[in-house]
């Protein structure tokens, strides 16, 4: 044990006070250095360029085919399929090709401590346009939490995990969206979906380890990760806009958002957001202008909330702006 250990309670309290005083003085004098350090260590998601480099190095002439097959694996069987392939369980036809892909690219079932690990989920998000076509054209795709689970009936196409790649936030800080943009609709939907799916699928041990056993902590965690994803520059603004319009196409007529999306959002408010505690709803209300409406009116009827959402969109300039 070090010789600097305080001998008495009074010594301990004095040491804490002295170090705190010195640390606060340092922060005051060197705030710029601390801010720079914070920016350097802040989690910013995986390095897409690193992943692309690995994929191109290992893929060669079959890269396009391989990515299509990997993304198909992700949406037909889920990210846990990698474990099945590795253990040679629950896999019949197609097992040889699946095993080859997992081995070739070093695909793992979860990120773990490797910030740039290659998972099926990351591949799907890295190539959102491919993912969009896979879920549209291939039967048997599934998600752990669908739109009916959120009271957002009929909106499954909005919930796929690649969709946040298309979202463009309006602000660097909360509230992240304030206008009636298509991004705003998708952002609100994914705040709730990312929370619900993580709460359902994350093992209890990991929740305790990360301090996520309370809804408010889980909501802050999942929203934080969503914001990081939305800020991704992997796609150009033009490609993001094209993606948003593809995803929301069925909810837009003549450049205007259909009332069906208003009703769906209202359903999410009264059926799902209403089940959250006050602290969680207060946090949600701070994230965007539309979410504020949904989080603060959960005691109203779905028809009333739908009317409020409709008013929000009509108060803005006409049209489904992007």
Swiss-Prot record:
A GO CC term assigned to this protein in UniProt: helical viral capsid
Statement: the UniProt record of this protein carries the keyword RNA-binding: yes
Source domain of life: Viruses
Transmembrane segments: none
Record's keyword annotation contains RNA-binding: yes
Cellular location(s): Virion; Host cytoplasm
Binding residues for RNA: 43, 46, 76, 122, 240, 269
InterPro entries in the cross-refs: Capsid_Phlebovir/Tenuivir (IPR009522), Nucleocapsid_Tenuivirus (IPR008864)
Keywords (A to Z) from UniProt: Capsid protein, Helical capsid protein, Host cytoplasm, RNA-binding, Viral nucleoprotein, Virion
Family statement: Belongs to the tenuiviruses nucleocapsid protein family.
Domain remark in the UniProt entry: The N-terminus is involved in homooligomerization.
Functional summary from the UniProt entry: Encapsidates the genome, protecting it from nucleases. The encapsidated genomic RNA is termed the nucleocapsid (NC), and serves as template for viral transcription and replication.
Protein name: Nucleoprotein
